[in-house]
Amino acid sequence: MRKSLLAILAVSSLVFSSASFAADLEDNMETLNDNLKVVEKADNAAQVKDALTKMRAAALDAQKATPPKLEDKSPDSPEMKDFRHGFDILVGQIDDALKLANEGKVKEAQAAAEQLKTTRNSYHKKYR
């Protein structure tokens, strides 16, 4: 009886930990989306830098996750490698926009951030 109870607890903890992991990916996606809106509406470099910095952290964290569509794939599968590569592209684009924001070029940073939407849309089609 005790072994059965321990087995049930072990399995349920794995189920709940994977569910919370998926929520983390969802939270990171929400952070990316919310802060992209901030970048688009910002009127000063400080707002843009703050939003882009939050986006960068969320993208790096999300890159470690596995989307529900790829849960049956191994971490080194071509699909998972492509999923992570999408975040490499996204982080590079965020860094480009952040560089412009650090130079006080708000409009240019906002224009550079528009590329994020193209990347988002492309990878959402594949993995969402």
Swiss-Prot record:
Chain segments annotated as coiled-coil in the UniProt record: none
Transmembrane regions: none
Cofactor: heme b
One GO CC term on file: periplasmic space
Signal peptide: 1-22
Keywords: Electron transport, Heme, Iron, Metal-binding, Periplasm, Signal, Transport
Pfam families: Cytochrom_B562
GO biological process assignments: electron transport chain
Subunit-structure text: Monomer.
NCBIfam families (alphabetical): PRK15058.1 (NF011632)
Function: Electron-transport protein of unknown function.
Family to which the UniProt record says this protein belongs: Belongs to the cytochrome b562 family.
Stated name of the protein: Soluble cytochrome b562
